[in-house]
Amino acid sequence: MRTDTDKLIIAGREFNSRLMVGTGKYADFQQMVKAIEVSGAEIITVAVRRVNISDRNKESLLDHIDTKKYTLLPNTAGCYTADDAIRTCRLAREAGLSDFVKLEVLGDEKTLFPDNEELLKAAKVLIKEGFTVLPYTTDDPIVCKKLEDIGCAAVMPLGAPIGSGLGIRNPYNIRIILDTVKVPVIVDAGVGTASDAAIAMELGCHGVLMNTGIAGAKDPIAMAEAMNLAVRAGRLAYRAGRIPKKLYATASSPVEGTIE
């Protein structure tokens, strides 16, 4: 099965890699750059709050990212209201980062769960202003459908709380979301190891976004490679079509020619 034609398409943009990665929590910029390279990711998300917009003379993580090679996805991490998230996206666009944004509006500091009411409010405004919005949301099919209906280019339900490494806690909801919306479904948050990423892709998700799963590993470079392979393997397995699960065995060897 050819994989070079199996591209991720978001708002008309084509990407070969279905893995998206963040830029935080690395030991240094050099480690970040190497991990991103090894991951094979083409979409890199950056927290607008971490980018030094006001003083370009100071070192910034953007100094270490080749924007001709990667697509930047500014995110609104740390925003707890729609107004704050909207302001942050406007700043990103004015600074020349991108109008292709990952929208986060958090509702709780302990769980970092999204505030879906504020998220929908912010998404409506940003879409009207011409932003391409990829919202981080709960694994609620109803909310995901509402986000699609107002014009979001994809939906990004969490697999588990941000940074928890708990994996895909509710695969059934993810399946329902996949059956409910037509835009790409990107699992965002909770992926802790390669098997988590593979499971997300085997469910039929169009991609996976992660940061802590790679940056927080004992060897981030090795984990970046593992996640790269896992996403590709999971996608290939999904397209290949797994065998159905059955309670009893089915012999894999032919019974013809057996000695009586």
From Swiss-Prot:
Gene3D superfamilies given in the database record: Aldolase class I
Protein's UniProt keywords contain Lyase: no
Key words, A-Z: Cytoplasm, Schiff base, Thiamine biosynthesis, Transferase
Binding site for 1-deoxy-D-xylulose 5-phosphate: G163, A189, G190, N211, T212
GO terms of biological process kind: thiamine diphosphate biosynthetic process
Function: Catalyzes the rearrangement of 1-deoxy-D-xylulose 5-phosphate (DXP) to produce the thiazole phosphate moiety of thiamine. Sulfur is provided by the thiocarboxylate moiety of the carrier protein ThiS. In vitro, sulfur can be provided by H(2)S.
Name of the molecule in the record: Thiazole synthase
Organism, scientific name: Geotalea uraniireducens (strain Rf4)
